[in-house]
């Protein structure tokens, strides 16, 4: 799917004004091998525990984007190279992590987009804590399951509806 977030913003000023199209705060870095991706969101809310991330990525992604609200923690990684490969294998087009990733070199080889706040060498806990398929707040932007995510080098957009046919 070819698009530019800049063009989507320009063509949808009324949606931006109404809040049905939102721009996530520009603090994310690209770690994946794909720089531009779009798809409906699947959401997770958790903190320093990536058990649910693996469980989600083991499912058929069907062209979706996994949005992981890790509370913005910079103390451990929620996604690494193995999970990046799993995302690619199972048809996820991208992962947005409000937190950290690790295995940056491996993630860069994955054919999936991966956006996160930073890299961190420490792995997360494995307690199974967190919830899935709930609205999350990522850097002040609300994202509900099924919202559309559009990401490229200029930013991340969240839309209540698909913007492209």
UniProtKB/Swiss-Prot annotation:
Substrate binds at residues 80-83, 102. Keywords: Lyase, Metal-binding. A divalent metal cation binds at residue 103. Transmembrane segments: none annotated. Divalent metal cation. Its EC number is 4.1.3.17, 4.1.1.112. GO terms for molecular function: 4-hydroxy-4-methyl-2-oxoglutarate aldolase activity; metal ion binding; oxaloacetate decarboxylase activity; ribonuclease inhibitor activity. It catalyses: 4-hydroxy-4-methyl-2-oxoglutarate = 2 pyruvate; oxaloacetate + H(+) = pyruvate + CO2. CDD domains: RraA_family. One of its GO terms (biological process) is regulation of RNA metabolic process. Its cofactor is a divalent metal cation. Belongs to the class II aldolase/RraA-like family. Homotrimer. Catalyzes the aldol cleavage of 4-hydroxy-4-methyl-2-oxoglutarate (HMG) into 2 molecules of pyruvate. Also contains a secondary oxaloacetate (OAA) decarboxylase activity due to the common pyruvate enolate transition state formed following C-C bond cleavage in the retro-aldol and decarboxylation reactions. This is Putative 4-hydroxy-4-methyl-2-oxoglutarate aldolase.
